[in-house]
Swiss-Prot record:
Name of protein: Methionine--tRNA ligase
Signal sequence coordinates: none
Reaction(s) catalysed by this chain's protein: tRNA(Met) + L-methionine + ATP = L-methionyl-tRNA(Met) + AMP + diphosphate
Enzyme nomenclature, EC number: 6.1.1.10
Organism of derivation: Rickettsia conorii (strain ATCC VR-613 / Malish 7)
Amino acid sequence: MNNTYYITTPIYYVNDIPHIGHAYTSVASDVIARFMRLRGFDVMFLTGTDEHGQKVEKAAINKNIDPQKFTDQTSESFRHLMTAMHISNDDFIRTTEHRHKKAVAVFWQKLLDNGTIYEGFYEGWYAVRDEAFFDESELTRDGLAPTGAPVEWVKEPSYFFNLSKWQDKLLEFYEANPDFIRPISRRNEVISFVKSGLKDLSVSRTTFNWGIKVPNNEKHVIYVWLDALANYISALGYLDEQSNYNKFWPADLHVVGKDILRFHAVYWPAFLMAAEVPLPKTIMAHGWWTNEGQKISKSLGNTIDPIKLIDEFGVDQVRYFLMREVTFGADGNFARSNLITRINSELSNKIGNLLQRTTSFVYKNNDAKVPLLTQGVIDKIYELPILKTASKFVEQNILLMDKTEINKILENIINLAEEANIYIDSEAPWNLKKTDPDKMLEVLYALLEVLRYIAIMLLPFIPSSANKMLDQLGVNKEERLFKHLIRDYTLTAGSNILEPTIIFPKFE
């Protein structure tokens, strides 16, 4: 088995500050990356910023600042988001970096040498906001791009990529690789778009300067999407024998928003085929967020600042809500009341309550120690229904993650916590203390073990809080991988637990 795993977010466009959509994509990708590390994979997790193009140049001009200084400032705000959201990326690529420009030039030359790029003249509609070209037939009745972006008529010399040549090859590839695009609804949209006919794509501009110059023809700037998509290989050191390229490419998963799926599922694989580069294995397109049922936009003044949410509720609480509230791939609605309800009813009432009740009882009634039981008794405990449920946890959740059904993993965790809360109520260790002390110890051990399973499975989602849970339980820091969720790595009988503290406070 290949033990490497390469996952990417899209690189984020730096014409504005980070918002909830950036946070959502980043957290989802981070959860997957952390999950794969816990499975024992050697993970490469990439994020970064897309810093070229007409939109960035205009934004810099409007602020009366040099484009490089502008991108330096805005790129830093995305780095700050990654730190604030506890994103565990292994690399952060900027398209203004030398390593990226060098790789793009090599990639361009490969396309040129293979006869897939030619010179011509572009005349048509272009949306600066989307950095995308559109046919007349794609415009709305109001003459806007499908995204609602205004378009302008562009006439200029251009290099073209012979996208039309790759139409049949793309359709053959989609057919042979049904898991290439997720979810299936997005896959069907892409196939329909490609079947409707592909036209050759303009891949250079001459009407602005902020971008990577075309090799040997500096009047042209490479189209921002060709430049940007190449980040996935430039960050690995494309064609550099000493780099990570041979180790990690092709990517296992590109996580993208549904608005940029066409670029990733049509243009990118066509570019790669033309450059004789293996294609990524899966592209996962997630949905958009609304705010209290309204479309989020600057004009409505209802953008959601993830940093402010973290400051108010805590990073793990925000991470949990984003992953729990929505089926990954579907659209979601941000409602403050729903965020508070998720935190209080699930993190605090179900997981936090179970942890507090169990550890407090052990701390006060068993000298702050994991019950000292024989292996025979521990084996008997593992035959309890609740431990049987926990024992199937890893296998079930790996299958769900393989299908990127992230919120269902959290549903499993909450269900197990509910089952454990029912178990503690029905067994009533506070009564057993008087009537059957040995049985009390068995019940406490079972509950502590269930909490160990829950905490390790929560590590990808709420890493800081889950590690605090494991610290309270006295779990060795070297025994917090999925491979440790078996009977061989049970809590050490007689070991100490920490004095309980509240990890999941409630909010009003």
